[in-house]
A protein has these predicted regions:
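Short acidic/polar hinge/loop motifs at secondary-structure boundaries
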Residues: 172-199
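Outer-membrane beta-barrel signature, preferentially recognizing the C-terminal barrel domain
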Residues: 424, 476, 550-598, 603, ...
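A short, solvent-exposed loop/turn motif at the edges and junctions
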Residues: 44-48, 71-85
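Gram-negative outer-membrane beta-barrel transporters
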Residues: 627-703
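Short, acidic, small-residue-rich periplasmic hinge/interaction motif at the N-terminus
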Residues: 26, 38-42, 75-79, 93-133, ...
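Short, acidic Ser/Thr/Gly-rich low-complexity loop/linker segments typical of extracellular
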Residues: 44-60
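Face-selective signature of the C-terminal outer-membrane beta-barrel domain
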Residues: 302-324, 355-512, 535-539, 593-599, ...
Length: 796
């Protein structure tokens, strides 16, 4: 860590009567909190250190000192030093102390004091978003270039660690998949201040997210200001066009803060998937190659309104709506072969097929929140949230295939057809109450939360389908009640402790086609978190952290009804899926805030994965979601940040790990594997002029073969580059991005005594885009003055 907790100098101080001294540090420009600043109290005569601490994430600090006159000294990276002489005769609250950014003017672009691109804090890794991907157009593009973060059409995850909970300004975004991707694409890169990856999140956060929490901190709106940005974007994915238009509006005047994000666009894509199955005992081989092509619009709107009744009491509302439509055509070529003694294959049958799919989905979310702070104790905080999340999905699918002899002659009775409609309705109601109380030099937080969710899944096949007419319906209720407590306490001038405990009670019930689900169970889980930090000086920092997390099943995975891809591949959910759980312990070391090492170990049990069962006689494959994964993982991570020259900076992250994975229900093991794996990512930024208005980036990610979800995955490489140019005093920004300049198709393998299955996924096509962001706005008071001047001139 760049900064360390500075504490009481000796035992002689402890023998005296002390009084509390507290305050809150904020940025002069926009009154946003300044965290992790060094707050020092010195003797005026010889500048001897009396006591010291650091500000928390809200900018608050608290010291204990004896009676007397002292020099208060505050240092924060990127800010001018703050000095103030004060006399302490009793408890003293300094209120808000404003820090001014240390900046100099370079060619009309303001460059503030250099922040490290990465900073390790007590329970999180913090990346400076302005440096990690300066050529990116949107927040989504920044995340694509953030080390360790994986962005796909299905959502966001941490590489090698699974899914995460996504927050914006500490508020959970209750979207997933394409809806989440669309929302993050609507925010311009310039709105993002930092990216926080909480690998050991406090107990106040849900126990979900087996990799932790991803918190996106946006820049605060200026006071007495109305403005925003508009961002058109156009590009190609392979040879197919993609385009979008996103607009952000922000308003802040006195007690009112409002925001509006509008985004929409059109995307078209193509993809390929090949599945190859070999049955050695039967001497047969089956191939299935599918080409996808799709297109569709997406749209999102998100609005927020906050009102500050007093400086210590505020209330707000956020709503969002994200509809999307996707039309996909699949052309499938399936073939059956006999394996000859020579090893060659003899074609037995062809099964060409065509499928058309239309998927419509929409998310609706609403949040009401109330927050109370206390001037007498800046770290004391009370907050209440109430949320609604609604999800609707409807998918219409049809598939038709014909069986043909190698010479093209139709095979009687081999035709396969279905026409299906599936839909999912999910409604969740959530409320939580959180309270934080100063406790000596630390804080104690506790709270409660309740979640009530109902999901209905329906599956209908018409009478002309080869499997006959079917109509199925399942309703699933889940209630989760949680209590938690968090303690953040410095133990001495070198040791700090953060620990928490979260208890969750989960009640489940449901009906399958009118039949009550008797085997669903209610259960209690306890989730501890621990962080222990040791900072011997300002050059070295050590940490020990441990946590237990869980990953609840997606509600679509609870539907047990057959979902046909074709006659050879059938997908099932499971109505009594349990949450997957992961325990992890990590030991970390940081040198000068730039060189980091972490040694960790973890165990995953009840992991949710698709269990594959193939019938060698019929080649029918069943893919069923089940609590079937058990994995031990041990790893060593390293990262390094270099910015010693003015024209170049780089961030290197790498990980070496060993995993032992078994896939199978209960105590059985159907397949899996064990072995060493390695990945490395490099993120480079080049500055082509002194004012840093013309920048370039290039990034590279490589992973050796590894195991995931029971599959043996082949090596993977991706790389891209970007250019950005800023002009008009930072108001206009042009960005050109190219993704997957280096890429390879992903290969997955499963081997059992009865079969071998290989999958080749061509889901990483080259794509490039040109984005333009124009930012506008002005002080509200200034606008009024200009209007008054115009009226005066008209009278003259």
């Amino acid at each position: 860590m760049l900064c360390v907790v500075l504490a009481l100098s000796s035992g002689s101080l402890l023998a005296q009567t002390t009084f509390p001294l507290q305050g809150t540090l904020k940025k002069t420009a926009d009154r946003t909190p300044v965290d992790f600043a060094n707050v020092l109290l010195r003797k005026p005569a010889d500048s001897t250190l009396v006591v010291g601490t650091t500000s928390d994430e809200h900018g608050g600090f608290r010291l204990e000192a004896p009676q007397g006159t002292f020099l208060l000294e505050i240092h924060a990276l990127g800010y001018k030093p703050f000095h103030k002489t004060l006399t302490l005769t009793g408890a003293l609250d300094l209120g808000e102390l404003l820090l001014t950014e240390e900046a100099k003017e370079l060619s009309a672009v303001q460059v503030t004091g250099r922040r490290p691109i990465m900073l390790r804090k007590a329970d999180r890794m913090v990346f400076d978003a302005t440096q990690i991907a300066p050529a990116a157009s949107s927040i989504l593009d920044v995340l694509r270039q953030t080390p360790g973060v994986n962005v796909s059409d299905d959502g966001i995850s941490l590489i090698g660690k699974g899914g995460v909970i996504v927050l914006i300004n500490d508020k959970r975004i209750r979207l997933s998949g394409a809806a989440l991707i669309s929302l993050l694409r609507s925010y311009p890169q310039s709105d993002l201040q930092e990216i926080q990856i909480l690998t050991t999140p406090p107990a106040k956060y849900e126990a979900e997210g087996n990799a932790g929490v991803l918190n996106l901190i946006l820049k605060k709106a200026k006071n007495d200001f109305f403005g925003g940005s508009i961002s058109p974007r156009f590009g190609f994915r392979r040879e197919r066009a993609i385009y979008s238009l996103n607009t952000n509006l922000n308003y802040k005047k006195d007690k009112v803060t409002a925001s509006l994000q509008l985004g929409g666009g059109w995307a078209s894509y193509d993809n390929s998937l090949g599945t190859y199955r070999t049955y050695p005992k039967q001497g047969t081989f089956h191939s299935s190659e599918t080409a996808f092509s799709g297109k569709g619009p997406h749209f999102n709107v998100r609005a927020g309104l906050d009102y500050a009744f007093t400086p210590e009491l505020s209330m707000g509302v956020n709503v969002s709506y994200s509809p999307e439509k996707d039309d996909t055509r699949r052309e499938n070529d399936s073939r059956d072969y006999r394996i000859l003694p020579s090893g060659e294959r003899e074609l037995l049958r062809l099964l060409p097929g065509v499928a058309d799919e239309t998927d419509k989905s929409q998310y609706t979310t609403a949040n009401v929140h109330l927050e109370k702070t206390f001037k007498s104790a800046p770290q004391r905080r009370l907050s209440w949230d109430a949320d609604y999340v609604g999800y609707r999905s409807q998918e219409g699918r049809n598939f038709t295939s014909r069986g043909l002899m190698p010479n093209g002659t139709p095979i009687p009775g081999s035709d396969f057809h279905f026409d299906a409609l599936t839909d999912q309705h999910t409604d969740s109601y959530i409320t939580s109450l959180d309270y934080t109380e100063p406790l000596g030099k630390g804080t104690l937080g506790f709270g409660a939360k309740g979640t009530w969710t109902r999901t209905t899944n329906r599956s209908d096949y018409d009478a002309k389908s080869s499997m006959g007419e079917r109509h199925d319906r399942i309703t699933f209720d889940e209630h989760v009640y949680a209590l938690y407590a968090d303690l953040n306490q410095p133990l001495s001038d070198k040791w700090s402790l953060r620990t928490g405990l979260r208890m969750e009670y989960t009640h489940t019930a449901g009906e399958n086609n009118g039949r009550r689900l008797e085997h669903l169970k209610s259960y209690i889980n306890v989730f501890p978190t621990l962080f222990l930090g040791f900072n011997p000086n300002d050059r070295h920092a050590f940490s020990l952290n441990g946590t237990v997390r869980l990953n609840r099943p997606h509600f679509g995975q609870l539907s047990p009804f057959a979902n046909y891809e074709n006659q050879y591949s059938i997908l099932h959910g499971k109505e009594d899926l349990r949450a997957a759980k992961r325990a992890q312990l990590a030991l970390g070391y940081t040198f000068l805030g730039a060189l980091n090492f972490q040694l960790d170990g973890g165990y995953l049990w009840d992991g949710i994965t698709q269990v594959i069962r193939l019938d060698p006689k019929t080649n029918v494959g069943s893919y069923t979601h089940d609590n079937a994964e058990k994995t031990w993982t041990f790893g060593l991570e390293n990262s390094f940040f270099f910015n010693r020259v003015s024209f170049f900076q780089t961030y290197i992250s790498q990980r070496l790990w060993y995993s032992d994975m078994k896939i199978g229900p209960e105590s059985t093991s159907l397949y899996g594997g064990a072995g060493l794996s390695y990945h490395v990512s490099l993120n480079n930024t080049f500055f082509f002029n002194r004012s840093k208005t013309f920048q370039g980036t290039c990034y590279l990610y490589y992973r050796t073969p590894s195991y995931d979800g029971g599959f043996h995955m082949g090596h993977m490489i991706t790389g891209g580059a970007g250019l950005s140019y800023t002009l008009l005093q930072g108001k206009l920004r042009l960005a050109l991005d190219a993704y997957n300049l280096l890429r390879n198709n992903l290969r997955l393998d499963v081997t059992t005594p009865d079969y071998q299955m290989n999958v080749e996924n061509g889901s990483n096509p080259f794509n490039c885009s040109l984005g333009v962001t124009y930012s506008f706005g002005a002080p509200i008071q200034g606008k009024s003055e200009r209007k008054s001047s115009q009226e005066l001139r008209s009278r003259m």
